[in-house]
Amino acid sequence: MIAPSPKSSEEEGQKDEEVLQGEQGDFNDNDTEPENLGHRPLLMDSEDEEEEEKRSSDSDYEQAKAKYSDMSPVYRDKSGSGPTQDINTILLTSAQLSSDVGVETPKQEFDIFGAVPFFAVCAQQPQQEKNEKSLPQHRFPATGLQQEEFDVFTKAPFSKKVNVQECHAVGPETHPKSIDIFDFTPFQPFLTSTSKSESNEDLFGLVPFEEIMGSQQQKVKQRSLQKLSSRQRRTKQDMSKSNGKRHHGTPTSKKKTLKPTYRTPERARRHKKVGRRVSQTSNEFVTISDSKENIGAAVTDGNDRGNVLQLEESLLDPFGAKPFHPPDLSWHPLHQGLNDIRADHNTVLPKQPRQNSLHGSFHSADVLTMDDFGAMPFTELVVQSITLQQSQQSQPVELDPFGAAPFPSKQ
């Protein structure tokens, strides 16, 4: 992109001339190059800028080298070398110099940019101070003071306030008042000082849980002992007050109020229904045992009523309840059409054989054996019906093996 020449700008308007003159700036119009009278191409500009940057970087490098030449003998020996100095040569020269002087460890190493490593600012001061006696003094003019001023970025010194004596503590010998590079005391000395305190606090200033719980348990024990002693005093006072009047206590005495209140309704129930209840704990069976009179009222015969009541009393289970009686089959709606034998028995007594139109009527309750629920086994029903019906009927009847209603056989 080449800017237009002043010849072409004369042909255009006056405004364009002003703009172009402002763009051209202070460049020389008497350039000998015919193609670009007003400007140079962009590629040439970039090359010139690169050369200027190289010069500026070289000057910066020389300044940094001049600064570090006071500290390190490496740069004093290699002051004539250019910016393309190799790292290996620096390390080799430093190792050679240290071996010549008789020092075991090499001096501070500088990276490509001429900066000191971050960890080497304060840690290597003790070694250098030991080596200052063996090395000539004119090579190290005030090394300790200058090393404090230089950090990684060769600007704001972090460790300005650190004394040379305190910087020894970063090495193997550490004492509780040592300060690190950032002017802070290490975390460990505070821990050792606080852990020896009486309260045994942890890192965060908190007392351990066991100590708190132990103190609380001791307090609880003391309180319980105090309560026990107060109770013993009360009982002794009560005994001394009620001495001699023990058996006839007035209704305002304390012993009646101390009794629990939940026992009184149970006692009242026990005194009211003591004749009718067998069990003291079950309240459900009171109504069942109270309904004895209702069962007996259904019986019409006066003589049978006494027998039935005696049977019921003897057959009560341990809970005071009677055996379960299923509803009579003759009263069931399914068997309403089979009521031909119901005329013999008007009422059904409990614990007596049930009227059954299928198997006939059973007259004696002693012959039949009932189970716990007032029902008879199937085999006994069949056998008893056969024997009873044979005694009633004059002619012999053949019965089917399944105990069905006896029909006269067709002989």
Swiss-Prot record:
Residues 220-234, 243-258 have a biased composition (Basic residues). This is Putative BMP-2-inducible kinase-like protein. Residues 1-87, 215-280, 392-411 are annotated as: Disordered. Residues 8-18, 53-68 have a biased composition (Basic and acidic residues). Residues 47-71 form a coiled coil. Keywords: Coiled coil. InterPro entries: AP2_assoc_SerThr_kinase (IPR051744), BMP2K_C (IPR028182). Disulfide bonds: none annotated.
